[in-house]
Amino acid sequence: MATFVIEGGHKLHGSITPQGAKNEALQVLCAVLLTKETVVINNLPDILDVNNLIDLIASMGVTVEKLAKGKYAFTARNLDTAYLRSADFLKKCNKLRGSVMFIGPLLARLGEVTYAKPGGDKIGRRRLDTHFQGMVNLGASFEYDHDLLAYRFEGKHLKGSYMLLDEASVTGTANIIMASVLAEGTTTIYNAACEPYLQQLCKLLNAMGAKISGVGSNLLTIEGVKELHGAQHTLLPDMIEVGSFIGMAAITGSELRIRNVGYRDLGIIPDAFRRLGIRIDVDGDDIIIPAQEHYQIESFLDGSILTVADAPWPGLTPDLLSVLLVVATQAKGTVLIHQKMFESRLFFVDKLIDMGAQIILCDPHRAVVVGHDHQRQLKPNNMTSPDIRAGIAMLIAAMSAEGTSKIDHIDQIDRGYEDIEHRLNAIGAKIRREE
């Protein structure tokens, strides 16, 4: 396992550009399975989760051509149905959570799919009920094969349906949309997730000939079509990387320009950092974080302690709560971080406490952070990354701590952040990878 060795306490400077959005990439890559024609995707990030999904798609019989850095052409003319039933396919699906979104496209295209329970981050339970119930609503059936440890879906003639989702699941909504675009009749999805990633998926599908209306709202209407054709698509900048860079600049007291952030699609993210006292200036589609030696957490109007909580879009993405928590350790004031959507994402805070942070872990979902106001710096520490977002939060903490820290299991960080050490070193960080 590779390790990051971080020499903390260095100021950042200059500018950095975010990669293409990881979560969007996983969705649109699955969508290429819906047509026999060529789909070209631009701005794909060079990260483990995306590269592994591309490799798996190629193994399924899809012709994959790399046209330039971040630009790929996919042609799913002849899918290898034998491979889709193989142990190798099931094993790879099990290791890659994004592959859950194969269910909708393959069911729509082939009328059947065998699928292993997916892996991914160990951040608590992430139910598949929304995905499965959506397929059932469209007329599919499924059963669990105890010998294969996999689910078998059948749905030769999917038909449109009205459905009210029990949760606004992002990947669940994506799966149902992709199954619905080739179904007979009209599908209505109420309480649909409406993240920018979903909006981008719908834009791609519409460019391929789908008929999806209500994009950007939680009420989607999909008129089924006979077939889809090729298209071109460009990914949004990764909002999680943008938030991570804001956090790095703030906690190190650095001035940093983050270029081409897709500001309109950041939603509430900039305001969440502003509530921690961080100044964020907007210059066109760039944001500038001025150097701040001190930043003060706001309180509610009645004087009570600020609560920062995740919520379905347009609420705050859960993927940035770990970053906000670390940034708050050096703010002036107190904040309650409430992780509502996952129950294990705050367990990394014990490592921050070892570094000198004042954090009270109330339960698996809530932590109170009492900021040091930079009066006491975090101490270096040796840590292990349990998941992508905790890993980047640990890296941010290590960058602010005077001295040398180590983070093991950094393949978790590589899953979501492209060439992160070289990009950060280019703006003043001191990070070394040891194999």
For the regions a language model picked out, list residue spans one by one.
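Short, structured segments at the rim of ligand-binding sites
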Residues: 1-435
